[in-house]
Amino acid sequence: MDIIDTALPDVKLLKPQVFTDGRGFFMETFRDGWFKENIADRTFVQENHSNSSKGVLRGLHYQTENTQGKLVRVVVGEVFDVAVDMREGSPTFGKWAGATLSAQNRYQLWIPEGFAHGFCVLGDAAEVVYKCTDYYNPETEQVLIWNDPAIGIGWPLQTAPLLSPKDLAGKTWAQAEKSALRFPDKKCRPNVSDGIFSDRLPTRLQYALCKEKHPGNEERQAQPRSGGIPVLQIQRERRIRAAVGHREGNNKRHNYTNQAFTDNQACREKRTDTVGVFQTAFAVFRLLANDVFQHRRQHRACHDGHIDGRRQINAHTDRKDGQGKFTA
């Protein structure tokens, strides 16, 4: 993908590489490793899909807590997509950037955490799909009015937009509650080498680490759950725990494999021993059977010889006359 800068340095326009032929087209819309390396180290947890008719304007929406980063693209129609920086302390605080997203140009807009987001439909209808880095929280959702002159968004509208009751009741810039995500000034922002800031976009934990540099904002700044441990140290410990867990899992699998091999080997040895016992018993049985068979055959031969001798004697006796002579 190609990365295109916008009026806000943290808001990026992404142009995908599209392959077309007579059958249609193919493109890769998202690759996690590339996005984390080139745009922001974020994990998306929710994806939304909206359909809007002609003249609809949605926004400007943001959450003061559980701030959401959004990766927006259009799958049907065309919209003008807008982001407004709501981070106090940011060099672009209160400024906006916009881009035209359509199913034809297939652009995507990355809007980091701490920005308000909205869009208006430019054609007959539009379908918008966007990924979020945090879950939707209606309790902390805020609406910034779409036409506040203090911001001065240049919506490309021909007629008055169609708005929801919630968007109609949006607050002006002066009334709106700003994002809980703070952008610290350069004087209090520690060096990356100090192991405190791990990314270009600070987190609430990082703001809490330098809260003494932001007087008056203590009630909005969450206490670090880790007790003020630097972010890089936390990430390093998480990686170590993950590596240890992975190594332990491999060891368990290795042990299971060894145990299975040992059990299989023992089973084979046991089976071999059993076969040997049966073979020995069968050989002994054959020897005994042969001895018995030979003994019975010899006994039969003796018995037959004895019977033949008796028959011959009886035959001679029957052929003798009274004087002891044989008769014809």
From Swiss-Prot:
Gene this protein is translated from: rfbC
Binding residues annotated for substrate, in chain numbering: 23, 28, 46-48, 58, 70, 117, 141, 166
Function, as annotated: Catalyzes the epimerization of the C3' and C5'positions of dTDP-6-deoxy-D-xylo-4-hexulose, forming dTDP-6-deoxy-L-lyxo-4-hexulose.
Catalytic reactions on record: dTDP-4-dehydro-6-deoxy-alpha-D-glucose = dTDP-4-dehydro-beta-L-rhamnose
Family: Belongs to the dTDP-4-dehydrorhamnose 3,5-epimerase family.
Record: active site: 61 (proton acceptor), 130 (proton donor)
Assembly, per entry: Homodimer.
UniProt keyword terms in alphabetical order: Carbohydrate metabolism, Isomerase, Lipopolysaccharide biosynthesis
Protein name: dTDP-4-dehydrorhamnose 3,5-epimerase
A GO term from the CC aspect: cytosol
Site (Participates in a stacking interaction with the thymidine ring of dTDP-4-oxo-6-deoxyglucose): 136
Gene3D superfamilies: Jelly Rolls
PANTHER family in the record: DTDP-6-DEOXY-D-GLUCOSE-3,5 EPIMERASE, THYMIDINE DIPHOSPHO-4-KETO-RHAMNOSE 3,5-EPIMERASE
EC number: 5.1.3.13
Pathway: Carbohydrate biosynthesis; dTDP-L-rhamnose biosynthesis; Bacterial outer membrane biogenesis; LPS O-antigen biosynthesis
Gene Ontology terms: biological process: dTDP-rhamnose biosynthetic process; lipopolysaccharide biosynthetic process; O antigen biosynthetic process; polysaccharide biosynthetic process
GO molecular function: dTDP-4-dehydrorhamnose 3,5-epimerase activity
